[in-house]
């Protein structure tokens, strides 16, 4: 990877690490990322250490059969403007979204923790709706491509975090389960409570950016030649203890938990947190989001998604990420919106 980053750096004129980041996000380099990620170290980490809980969340187990649940979920996805004439949803061992604009394939799995299954499904649907609404006339040209992984992730996280995990929308989900008090308790435990968890993909929304920040800092040190290979594990463990108050006892729950570095994927991790920040900035500046929160009926949900289609999905690569945010919010990427969202959901 050092050789690849060196050659890319020579070709692009970027620093070795920035040349890797640019494979996944052409708009934000490490200087900008340092700027917006400062909110993680200055604000999110101290608040996390103050409000974190050690206990595990309550898990609700559904007694609805998988086929029946899948049928109910499909109706929800139709409300979210996922076009089943140009896509489909199936069950698999792991959730993902793939295919092309006119043939989007989403998969999910229904497991004991039904909330995690539904959360993953809404996440993948966000990716799918973005893909289905890229401009057809420019589909095979650079202009018609999705802007970046950060923007793509912002849409999946908008569907997952700002729609599915909102308390008002959850009530419409709980209707499927007979307005279960147990499911409501599980929902609040999972998505409105901050907990210690060593695994990134299982972390709550508040602590998740800290997991990303740890990886970003280590990657940056690797490609700036500030750390030796043999010291990476110790730095990882130290950061988990300092930032997350987690004393790691195994590499399975530590440095070996992700597939990215095995596959030679460096510079990817920042896009997860950048996507969350973009999604939050969109949320606070979308004129229809407040209407959705007041009444998440089919019409208001449809209007909200059409707004996303018009202002983000159909713009594809016409604008840079900051230009897109300028048109929506009047300013470039600003991490204060992300902090506001986390405080509103987990602290207030």
Report residues per predicted region.
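All-alpha helical catalytic cores of prenyl diphosphate-utilizing isoprenoid enzymes
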Residues: 37, 41, 66-90, 125, ...
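Contiguous, non-catalytic segments that form substrate-binding/exosite surfaces or channel walls
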Residues: 1-115, 319, 331
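Active-site metal-coordination segments of metallo-dependent hydrolases
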Residues: 142-153, 207, 266-271
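Alpha-helix capping and helix-loop boundary segments enriched in small/acidic/polar residues
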Residues: 64, 112-116, 143-150, 205
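Active-site recognition of the HExxH zinc-binding catalytic motif
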Residues: 110-135, 153-157
């Amino acid at each position: 990877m050092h050789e690849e980053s060196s050659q890319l750096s020579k070709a692009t004129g970027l620093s070795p690490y920035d040349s890797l980041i640019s494979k996944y996000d052409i708009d934000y380099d490490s200087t900008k990322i340092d700027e917006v990620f400062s909110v993680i170290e200055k604000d999110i980490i101290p608040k996390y250490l103050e409000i974190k809980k050690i206990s595990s969340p309550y898990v609700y187990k559904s007694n609805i059969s998988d086929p029946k649940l899948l049928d109910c979920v499909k109706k929800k996805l139709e409300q979210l403007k996922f076009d089943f004439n140009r896509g489909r949803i199936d069950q698999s061992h792991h959730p993902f979204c793939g295919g092309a604009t006119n043939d989007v394939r989403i998969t999910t799995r229904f497991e004991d923790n039904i909330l995690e299954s539904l959360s993953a499904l809404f996440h993948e649907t966000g990716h799918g709706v973005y893909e289905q609404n890229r401009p057809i006339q420019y589909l095979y040209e650079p202009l018609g491509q999705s802007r970046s992984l950060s923007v793509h992730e912002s849409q999946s996280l908008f569907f997952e975090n700002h729609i599915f995990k909102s308390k008002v929308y959850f009530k419409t989900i709980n209707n499927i389960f007979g307005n279960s008090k147990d499911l409501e308790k599980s929902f609040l435990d999972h998505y409105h409570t901050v907990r210690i968890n060593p695994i990134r993909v299982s972390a709550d929304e508040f602590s998740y950016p800290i997991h990303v920040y740890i990886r970003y800092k280590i990657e940056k040190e690797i490609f700036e030649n500030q750390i030796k290979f043999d010291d990476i594990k110790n730095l990882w463990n130290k950061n988990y203890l300092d930032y997350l108050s987690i004393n790691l006892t195994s590499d399975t729950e530590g440095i070996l938990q992700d597939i990215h570095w095995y596959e030679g994927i460096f510079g990817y991790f920042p896009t997860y947190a950048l996507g969350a920040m973009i999604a939050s900035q969109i949320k606070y500046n979308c004129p229809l989001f407040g209407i959705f929160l007041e009444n998440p009926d089919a019409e208001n949900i449809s209007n909200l998604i059409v707004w996303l289609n018009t202002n983000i999905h159909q713009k594809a690569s016409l604008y840079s990420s900051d230009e897109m945010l300028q048109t929506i919010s009047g300013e470039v990427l600003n991490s204060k919106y992300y902090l506001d969202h986390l405080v509103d959901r987990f602290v207030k």
